[in-house]
Each structure stands twice: as C-alpha cells, then as structure tokens.
Amino acid sequence: MMRTFEQLTASQQKEVERQLQLYMTGAHEVIPPEELKAKLVKSISTGTPLKIKLGLDPSAPDVHLGHTVVLNKLRQFQENGHIVQLLIGDFTGKIGDPTGKSAARKQLTDEEVQHNAKTYFEQFGKVLDPEKVELHYNSKWLKTLNLEDVIELAGKITVARLMERDDFEERIAMQKPISLHEFFYPLMQGYDSVVLESDIELGGTDQHFNVLMGRHFQERYNKEKQVVILMPLLEGLDGVEKMSKSKHNYIGINEHPNDMYGKTMSLPDSLMKKYIHLATDLELEEKKQLVKDLETGAVHPRDAKMLLARTIVRMYHGEKAAEAAEHSFKTVFQENSLPEDIPAVNWKGEKTIAMIDLLVKLKLLSSKSEARRMIQNGGVRIDGEKVTDVHAKAEIRENMIIQVGKRKFLKLQ
C-alpha cells in the first residue's frame, strides 16, 4: 500500500519538500504539481528512483544555452538519484516535429539521424553525467508496430484533439497543406512514454502539446500518468526571439571561451535575471542574492554580467578558461588593446585584393553579402582603422591585423 506524505518520517517529509521545491523552482509550469509531490513521496518512501524522460528530435544537433535550460533541470533529478531517460527520436525525427512550423519539414535520412544523435550525446556530457543516462532510440519499438497496432494507437485520440495545435490551425487558415503523417508525430511521442513508463517528462513551453500526449496515451493504456514539467524558453542575444542557431542569436556550449564570454557580455541588461536563474549552476540562494543586489543597485550591472559570463564559461570549459576569457575581454574591451593570442595566417594570395573577398577567403565571414553588411555597419578594422568603403581594396603587408566585430582578430604573415 502506497504511503501518504503524512505517513512519512520527519526526515522523509523534509526530503520530499526539498526536492519538490528544487524541481519546481525555475519551471514555467508543472502539470499537475500535486502528482509530482505524490511521485516523490512514493519514490522516497520505497527507495525507487523516478524515470525522467527528455525526448530529442535530432534535426539540429548543435547544443546552445537555450537547450541547457531543460538539461540543467534534468541534471537536478540526476544528482538526486533519479533515472534520466534520453530518448533519441531516430524514428520520429524522420517525420519531423511540426511544432511552430508553417510548412512540413524535410525528412532526415538514417545516416543524418545517427550522426546528429551522436553529436547530441557528446555535447550533453558537458551537463549530464553520461554514465548515469539511459539512452533510448524509439525506432526499437516503433519499427515493430504493424498496421493493426498503428490503427489501435490512432484510435486512442480524436482528430479534434490533434487539431488543437496552434500550428495546424494556422496552416489551415493560411491554406497551407498538412500531410497525414504529421499527425502521427505527437501520437508516437506519446507512445514513447507508454513504452518507457516515464514518471516525468521535461520540455520547453513550445512542446506543451507534445509532452501532454504522454499523459494522454499512458492513461489510455492503463499506465500511471507522467507529470509534465515545462521550462521557459530562453531569449537569445537580441533579447526578443527564442535562442536559435537559425536566428544567429545563440551562445553555443562548444564555442571558444572568449566568444562565449563576449557574447554573454553583449546581452541586454533586461535578460540578466533570467539568465542568472536559467543558464547558470549557481546555488539558488546565490542566484536570489545576485538578483536582489542588481535590483537594489548593490552591484553594478556590468560587474554582475561579468560574473554571469565567467560562470557560464566555467560551466562548459573550466575555471582556467573562464579566467583567461575574462582577462582577454578586459584587455580588448576595457583597456582598448589587442588580445595577446591573435591567430596568425600565412597569406599566399594577391598583394592587392578586394576587402570583401579577403574577409571571405580568410573565413572571417561566411559570404560576400555578410562581409558587405559588416563593413557598412562599421565592424571591420585594419590595424585599428575602420573600413568604411565596401569597394575598398586591401594592400596586404606583413603583420597586418584584421578585426571583424568585437571578438574576431587575425594577423597576416
């Protein structure tokens, strides 16, 4: 017989309350919170760890700080002895999650899915303990379903329920087609939770519909329903859009420490509190104190942002790299001097070359149009002198230093 909270010992009750507060802190929504508490009571009273699921569509494997909001929450469960279920949607990934899309997505090949899944797992090791992760591929069970199984699965949900998705409604309103196979994505994601018997599923707020499918199908298959924890979406460097590589407003966890530090320092002040709470591993009381100091003016926003930048770099590259990145930032931006470790390139090309062509050939910028925009915006300097003419020619000379933006430097030899 399952024990109630009141039947636990005082120390067990204290542990339930501690974990409950930990997991709910920073979450956008817990559905429903009373069931989360009940699951913790059962786990702590029986010594049975909970199974925490995170589903991944391996279509964009570069992990940035936006992804780590959910990963950091997952790590909290892992550190308290619960089982992390990383579900690679190698089967569903070939369909593509239509969430937030105004058109159907290109299907991935098996090779693309496997490569992206491997890349994901390697990067997640910077946040999670990979030795304590259960890695699952949903093709293991979805490939075994026959037509009768699929029809049975489809019969456990209505078309009206599937049409509640905002993106489907928008596409119908815009007279854009919806392929039948797209309806199966949330069905299969929900069925994953049935197979894994997950106790809790994590996701961003944009995954609200999909993760609730797990609860729906677990109930229809007479399983205990999972609790859903939705985490906030992290805005990118522009302070407006959700962090995304396609929006060019992201901080990648594999980026060079100097770039990571510099990008963090470019954040709008209005985002600092959110980043402190969602993107750092500081203790809860440290986070609260730092935010309080910001609000009262006890700490200057610049100093708080430097602490934020140093913390983020330290999390993914270590303390020494964080200190070096801070030193480099101070040297370049606060003392207006050049960094000490400017990479050098042995130039064997023309002695005179169009500035735009030079920037692209050196891979400082990815295209001529991007190089043109950077020059127009005053972001290119040669030996400290700003380049203002998009048609300018560069006269190549030894030890010439090219600066692009605030953080890219290159010396020609």
Swiss-Prot record:
List GO terms (cellular component aspect).
cytosol
Could you list this entry's UniProt keywords, alphabetically sorted: Aminoacyl-tRNA synthetase, ATP-binding, Cytoplasm, Ligase, Nucleotide-binding, Protein biosynthesis, Repeat, RNA-binding
Gene3D superfamilies listed in its UniProt record: HUPs (3.40.50.620), RNA-binding S4 domain (3.10.290.10), Tyrosyl-Transfer RNA Synthetase (1.10.240.10)
Cell compartments where the protein resides = Cytoplasm
Q: Which reaction does it catalyse?
A: tRNA(Tyr) + L-tyrosine + ATP = L-tyrosyl-tRNA(Tyr) + AMP + diphosphate + H(+)
A single GO molecular-function term is:
RNA binding
Q: Where is this motif: 'HIGH' region?
A: 58-67
Pfam families the record matches = SYY_C-terminal (PF22421), tRNA-synt_1b (PF00579)
Can you cite a GO biological process for this protein? tRNA aminoacylation
Record's function text: Catalyzes the attachment of tyrosine to tRNA(Tyr) in a two-step reaction: tyrosine is first activated by ATP to form Tyr-AMP and then transferred to the acceptor end of tRNA(Tyr).
Which proteins does it associate with, and in what oligomeric form?
Answer: Homodimer.
UniProt-recorded name of the protein = Tyrosine--tRNA ligase 2
Q: What is the lineage of its organism?
A: Bacteria, Bacillati, Bacillota, Bacilli, Bacillales
